[in-house]
Amino acid sequence: MEVKRKVISMGERDVIQEARTTITLLQTAFSKGFTPSLDALRFRENLDQMLKGLRKARRVDNRLLMELEKFYQTASLLIGLGGLALNEEAFQAWRAYDHWHYEVVKPQLQVYGPMVLL
């Protein structure tokens, strides 16, 4: 049985490049003020994994959007509730990604199955 993935049209936007750019800026800003801790290592691993996934991505489909959402949720948890302290530059880069994520990813994301609001 062949499964066809729905490719999501985003008009003129190059979502993969925009995501790669904003996450790379976040990674660069975070690396400047990096203080080793368990949450900081998780955050850096999360950044590296997402950038690796974006390098492999060829098109914008729901799988990519779900990976971006997973990245966002994990990073948001580490920043908001974890012990991760961002310097001012990294915090501003995070806010820029946060804004971009809500503007681009959230409206296009299609979640299948039951949803639980936290």
List the predicted regions and their residue ranges.
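Intrinsically disordered, low-complexity, compositionally biased regions/tails
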Residues: 15, 37, 57, 84-87, ...
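Short terminal alpha-helical segments
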Residues: 2-49, 109-115
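Amphipathic alpha-helical binding modules
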Residues: 72-118
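Amphipathic alpha-helical interaction modules
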Residues: 26-81
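Generic detector of well-ordered alpha-helical segments enriched in charged/polar residues
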Residues: 16, 20, 24-27, 48, ...
